[in-house]
Regions:
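Structural recognition of the conserved hydrophobic beta-strand(s) that form the central parallel beta-sheet
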Residues: 147, 172-176, 186-193
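Walker A/P-loop
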Residues: 67-107, 132-136
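Short regulatory helix/loop adjacent to the ATP-binding pocket of P-loop NTPases
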Residues: 194-207
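Conserved AAA+ ATPase "SRH/arginine-finger" region at the nucleotide-binding site
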Residues: 207-225
Length: 283
């Protein structure tokens, strides 16, 4: 089956073009990048550099059966795992720009993209995704990053008390597809909040990294890079920073997502000129 014949099996909204990645990350180390504020802190930059170096080496090697099939990023919610995977795709896209090759694509796959009620359809969707990876998602010969987000909802451990018969079948198709992946053209990234729920045979096929809660300095740096908050006065920014330090110490703010919500409430309070009635939500 050609990729074009199977294209209807994968929603176009799940294919993120290099052009869209550029909108998020071009100039990501400056304040004008919409996605850059989530990629701060030396730990995140070190992770990005390592993932990029490994994937780039395998893509340039030309060997379709590289030793590293991809990466598994695990950690608490809101710590930037998905953003890190998208940034990896952008960095690879920058390194493999060529007049002779189409721009790379990022395929975003979650449980909703895979799960289907009819027996065998979910397995067929997994096969279709890897078929696209071999031939190109939107153009022949296109390189790609396959991002399986919250992968524990798709490929559950066979020994789990929550696993169903169809989980075994999906896992089996995924095992085979991973082993057949052309690592000179595609890289897989899995993200998970609960790696203990993922089948061990899947975990063993990937390099595993922990993306943990950022430190206080990183959270402050992230807040300071949000463009909308530049409008705050020096006194307001100092107050926000002091409040953030207190929120981190009492555990109210832990993740990047928490910090973004914290900044949003401060911004709203500036508009209202009083404290917002919005409730704080902890992941």
């Amino acid at each position: 089956m050609r990729a074009s014949d199977a294209h209807h099996h994968l929603s176009s909204s799940n294919i993120i073009s290099f052009e869209k990645l550029e909108l998020l990350f071009k100039g990501a180390d400056t304040e004008d990048a919409r996605g850059g504020s989530e990629m701060v802190g030396q730990r995140y930059l070190d992770l990005l550099a390592e993932l990029t170096a490994i994937a780039e080496y395998q893509w340039r090697s030309g060997s379709p059966r590289g030793l590293v099939k991809g990466f598994m990023l695990s950690g608490p919610p809101g710590t930037g795992k998905t953003t890190l995977a998208k940034r990896l795709a952008y960095e690879l896209g920058c390194r493999f720009q060529s007049d002779n090759d189409p721009p790379i694509a990022l395929a975003f796959i979650d449980g909703g993209e895979i799960s289907r009620s009819r027996y065998g359809e979910s397995e067929e969707r997994i096969r279709d995704i890897f078929l696209h990876a071999r031939s190109g998602f939107t153009a022949q010969g296109q390189r790609s990053v396959l991002l399986f987000d919250d992968v524990e909802s798709i490929f559950m451990a066979r020994g789990s008390q929550h696993a169903k018969e169809w989980h075994f079948s999906q896992d089996s198709v995924f095992f085979h597809s991973i082993d057949e992946l052309d690592t000179s053209r595609s890289t897989i990234v899995l993200t998970s909040n609960r790696p203990d729920l993922i089948d061990e045979a899947i975990r063993d096929r990937f390099l595993s990294y922990v993306v943990d809660y950022p430190d206080l300095e990183t959270l402050i740096q992230m807040i300071e890079q949000i463009p909308a908050l530049v409008q705050l006065s020096g006194a307001q920014r100092a107050t926000m920073k002091n409040d953030l330090v207190a929120a981190v110490k009492d555990g109210t703010v832990r993740s990047m997502r928490d910090a973004q919500r914290f900044a949003m409430r401060h911004f709203v309070s500036k508009i209202l000129k009083k404290d917002s009635l919005a409730q704080h939500v902890v992941d």
